[in-house]
Amino acid sequence: MVHLTTLLCKAYRGGHLTIRLALGGCTNRPFYRIVAAHNKCPRDGRFVEQLGSYDPLPNSHGEKLVALNLDRIRHWIGCGAHLSKPMEKLLGLAGFFPLHPMMITNAERLRRKRAREVLLASQKTDAEATDTEATET
């Protein structure tokens, strides 16, 4: 008996399986399904299996929600499925893969930039406070 997964895992003519994001939702309210699909199929078209979901807009608690079926993702990667760049980043943030070095570098740059902005803002308020004290006396 031939298993269905072996048929799906074999490279079909003209492409391979890819784990990627399929756009859903409506205008100004995106929602993504994480799917295993053939790379030649359209972004929102037919897929082999849905592996999770991703809501990029923060909820009332400021959280972006991601649901992943890591066992099935591991299965499809074992079958030879490729990952899209956004999925590599998402799985890196989830701890499934190591983070890309540029993500770490960008986070450090952003942290330094925000610290510098806070420092400049505090210096500006201190300077304004001393100016108002000098004019009052």
Curated annotation (Swiss-Prot):
GO biological process terms, semicolon-separated: mitochondrial translation; translation
Entry-linked InterPro entries: Ribosomal_bS16 (IPR000307), Ribosomal_bS16_dom_sf (IPR023803)
Chief location bin: mitochondrion
GO molecular function: structural constituent of ribosome
Pfam short name (any one): Ribosomal_S16
Gene Ontology cellular component list: cytosol; mitochondrial inner membrane; mitochondrial small ribosomal subunit; mitochondrion
Protein localization: Mitochondrion
Phosphothreonine, modified sites: 130
Keywords attached to this entry: Mitochondrion, Phosphoprotein, Primary mitochondrial disease, Ribonucleoprotein, Ribosomal protein, Transit peptide
Transit pept. (range): 1-34
Disease: Combined oxidative phosphorylation deficiency 2: A mitochondrial disease resulting in fatal neonatal metabolic acidosis with agenesis of the corpus callosum.
Subunit structure: Component of the mitochondrial small ribosomal subunit (mt-SSU). Mature mammalian 55S mitochondrial ribosomes consist of a small (28S) and a large (39S) subunit. The 28S small subunit contains a 12S ribosomal RNA (12S mt-rRNA) and 30 different proteins. The 39S large subunit contains a 16S rRNA (16S mt-rRNA), a copy of mitochondrial valine transfer RNA (mt-tRNA(Val)), which plays an integral structural role, and 52 different proteins. bS16m has a zinc binding site.
Family, as annotated: Belongs to the bacterial ribosomal protein bS16 family.
Protein name, per record: Small ribosomal subunit protein bS16m
Annotated organism of origin: Homo sapiens
